[in-house]
């Protein structure tokens, strides 16, 4: 028997193993602190969806989508409208990713909530149309399946390697995470879960050139949510796909997305199932406090630390004394964000992906929030920001590549006209060295949600999500999320 035919007849492997785990996962298998943490990650995703729903690029996406998509049964967050499941999932995902404030994983970069929540919410409304009631614990279990599977599959292909090579990695290995989360919500058997995974994986894609302009980068995790949801729904209807899609030697997911990476071995399929049930990636999903790429949070925090230490030296009135800013980054961060904008005006997304521009706005405004990247009132044309951005250079430091949790590290050196300099290093920014406390996530939720809706609705959503494990029907939650919100930028 040839190797290829043996492979094609394989009945077990990591695909089968993770599908069995996902299909059979029960609340009794999950530590109570993991169940609790999942609720806060869901709350953070909801806050990001609300604050991202009415920014200009999200409104443009909704207008375009509504022009060709018919109404459906699935709610669009913040709009009071409904679409079909696939369209609703993509739209809601675009909202969560819209402001670069949503979660990320520091070892296998992806934005979990933007994949898992839109797919799971849409799948639940499909079942509701069929007369089935979805409980809060159903949603938590499905979310945890997504939170746990995405980083594992990403680590199997060396996490940020795809990003270094120009792929939008989260849009790639987010697809199987979306399929597993959807499959869990739909109650798929392990066999059908493999079908869902196969359908999702054969669609996986995303190009990182999207960071240089336009709007499409905002919805590329939506492609993963769409692919996962579509895979789950088709499998739920009996549609079949290839089995063993992750590990197949010919045309398999792990093999195809690691070709030419120069690694030995090219991929580590054991990572797909490493520590299942004992190590919980739900606690390694990082919460953002800055509205920019998570890989440069270390340098931003370093600048913030220097501003606290040298308030007079880095006072806005004295920034013209800066001669040069150099930042050392991990390979992934430098590949992704270590570029200087060449064209003006810069787009919002490009500003949020350029370490030069990001550090310049932190120096000028002493904060790095959504308002720093607003396209209103020539905000992205400010001369003082551009003057500093052109003084920023970056290089990669192999030191930061040794630990997967240091991918967002940074060492910043600021040189002044008089020849003096100051330096600060942050290897693991806030939320990476230790998980962000739940209380800090709640504060972020209240701040973001409170900027786009009234206090009573903020409290209602908070109570429903933090009591999700006791909620017998999630319809009231989805109905509240559907209520129109305002733009955070006006």
Curated annotation (Swiss-Prot):
Recount the biotech application.
Answer: A.terreus has been used for the industrial production of itaconic acid because of its high production rate. Itaconic acid is used as a monomer to form polymers that are widely used as raw materials for latex, synthetic resins, adhesives, paint, and additives for acrylic resin fibers and paper. It is also used as an acidulant and for the pH adjustment of foods.
Q: Name one GO cellular component term.
A: mitochondrion
Quickly give the catalysed reaction: cis-aconitate + H(+) = itaconate + CO2
Question: Mitochondrion: present as a keyword of the record?
Answer: yes
**Stored Gene3D superfamilies:** 2-methylcitrate dehydratase PrpD (3.30.1330.120)
Q: What is its EC number?
A: 4.1.1.6
Q: Which UniProt keywords apply?
A: Lyase, Mitochondrion
Indicate where this protein resides in the cell.
Answer: Mitochondrion
Q: What is its main location?
A: mitochondrion
Is the Acyltransferase keyword given for this protein?
Answer: no
Q: Which Pfam families match?
A: MmgE_PrpD_C (PF19305), MmgE_PrpD_N (PF03972)
Q: Name one GO molecular function term.
A: aconitate decarboxylase activity
The entry sums up its family as follows: Belongs to the PrpD family.
Q: What does this protein do?
A: Involved in the production of itaconic acid, a soluble unsaturated dicarboxylic acid mainly produced from sugars.
**What name goes with this protein?**
Cis-aconitate decarboxylase
């Amino acid at each position: 028997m040839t190797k290829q035919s043996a492979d094609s007849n394989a009945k077990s492997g990591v695909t089968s193993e993770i599908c069995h785990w996902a299909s059979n996962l029960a609340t009794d298998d999950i530590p109570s602190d993991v169940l609790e943490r999942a609720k806060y990650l869901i709350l953070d995703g909801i806050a990001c969806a609300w604050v991202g729903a009415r920014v200009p690029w999200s409104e443009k996406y909704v207008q375009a989508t509504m022009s060709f998509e018919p109404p459906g049964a699935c709610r669009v967050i913040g709009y009071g409208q409904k679409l079909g499941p696939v369209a609703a999932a993509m739209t809601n995902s675009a909202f969560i990713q819209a402001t670069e404030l949503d979660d990320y994983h520091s070892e296998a970069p992806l934005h979990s909530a933007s994949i898992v929540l839109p797919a799971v919410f849409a799948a639940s409304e499909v079942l509701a149309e069929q007369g089935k009631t979805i409980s809060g614990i159903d949603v938590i279990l499905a979310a945890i399946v997504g939170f746990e599977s995405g980083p594992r599959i990403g680590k199997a292909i060396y996490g940020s390697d795809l990003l270094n090579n120009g792929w939008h990695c989260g849009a790639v290995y987010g697809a199987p995470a979306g399929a597993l989360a959807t499959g869990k919500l739909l109650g798929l058997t392990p066999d059908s879960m493999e079908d869902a995974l196969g359908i999702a994986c054969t669609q996986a894609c995303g190009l990182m050139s999207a960071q240089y302009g336009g709007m499409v980068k905002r919805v590329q995790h939506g492609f993963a949510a769409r692919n996962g949801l579509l895979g789950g729904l088709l499998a739920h209807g009996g549609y079949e796909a290839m089995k063993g899609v992750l590990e197949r030697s010919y045309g398999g997911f792990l093999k195809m997305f690691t070709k030419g990476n120069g690694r030995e071995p090219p991929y580590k399929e054991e990572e797909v199932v490493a520590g299942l049930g004992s190590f919980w990636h739900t606690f390694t999903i990082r919460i953002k406090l800055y509205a920019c790429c998570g890989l440069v949070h270390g340098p931003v925090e370093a600048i913030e630390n220097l501003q606290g230490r040298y308030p007079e030296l880095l006072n806005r009135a004295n920034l013209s004394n800066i001669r040069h800013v150099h930042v050392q980054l991990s390979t992934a961060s430098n590949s992704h964000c270590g570029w200087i904008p060449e064209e003006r005006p810069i787009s919002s997304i490009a500003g949020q992906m350029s370490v030069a521009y990001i550090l310049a706005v932190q120096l000028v405004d002493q904060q790095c929030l959504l308002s720093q990247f607003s396209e209103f009132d020539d905000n992205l044309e400010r001369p003082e920001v551009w003057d500093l951005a052109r003084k920023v250079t970056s290089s990669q430091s192999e030191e930061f590549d040794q630990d997967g949790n240091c991918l967002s590290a940074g060492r910043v050196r600021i040189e002044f006209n008089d020849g003096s300099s100051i330096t600060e290093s942050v290897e693991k920014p806030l939320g990476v060295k230790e998980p962000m406390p739940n209380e800090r996530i709640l504060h972020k939720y209240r701040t973001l949600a409170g900027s786009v809706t009234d206090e009573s609705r903020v409290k209602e959503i908070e109570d429903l999500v933090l009591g999700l494990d006791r909620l017998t029907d999630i319809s009231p939650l989805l109905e509240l999320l559907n209520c129109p919100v305002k733009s955070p930028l006006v």
